[in-house]
C-alpha cells in the first residue's frame, strides 16, 4: 500500500470519528433515555407464570395473610421487576515490585593453518595480509535489565438502585442498575450488573457488591472534563501504529 494512501486513510478515519463530537460542541451532554433499557422492560412485561407455582390458600379465620403486602410479609426483592439497593464500598490497595537482569556473552574463533598446502596458496591471493589462520572470529554480548513497580489505592463508596431483570431456574436473580448524574457539563455514569442469591439480600432490601457474582461495575463519565483527560485522536493513532 502506498504510504500516502495509508496516511490519508488514517486522517479520514480520525475525521469521521470526530464528526459526532463536533455536533455536540457548546452543548451539555445528554442523558440516555431509560425507556429502552432492560430495567424498564422487566418492570412492564409480565413474565410467563411458572406452572410449579401453587397459589397460597387464604385462611378464612386468620387476621394475617402470607402475602408480601402483609404486616409481617417479606418485602425483599425476589421477582422480575422488583427493585433493590446495591451498596458499593470498595477500599482496595495493592503494591507489587519486581526486577530482572540477564547477561550473556560468547566468543568463537576458527582458523586453518595447514591443509595440504591450500592455506598458503590462498594467503597469497588475500589482500592486506589476510590469512586463513585467522579466518573466523566472532564475539557477541547481550545484556538486559528491567524493573517495575505497581502501587494502587482505590476507594469508591456508592449506592445505586438495581432492578431484577431475570429469575433463573435455580432461583438466582440477575440484576441490572444504572444511574446518571449531570453536573454542569459533565455526566457521571454508574452501571452495575451481576447475579445474586435471594438469601443474600438483607432485610433492608439491600445487597453488598462483594456478594454479587460476575459483578460488572462501571463508574465513569462523559463531558468536557473527560474530553480534557483523554488524548487526542492523532496521539492515540501514533501510540498504536508507531513501533518505537
Swiss-Prot record:
GO cellular component, one term: bacterial-type flagellum basal body, distal rod, L ring
InterPro entries (alphabetical): Flag_Lring
Species of provenance: Jannaschia sp. (strain CCS1)
Disulfide partners: none
Keywords: Bacterial flagellum, Cell outer membrane, Lipoprotein, Membrane, Palmitate, Signal
Subunit organization: The basal body constitutes a major portion of the flagellar organelle and consists of four rings (L,P,S, and M) mounted on a central rod.
Lipidation (N-palmitoyl cysteine): 19
Signal sequence, renumbered to the chain: 1-18
Name of the protein in its database record: Flagellar L-ring protein
Family: Belongs to the FlgH family.
GO biological process, one term: bacterial-type flagellum-dependent cell motility
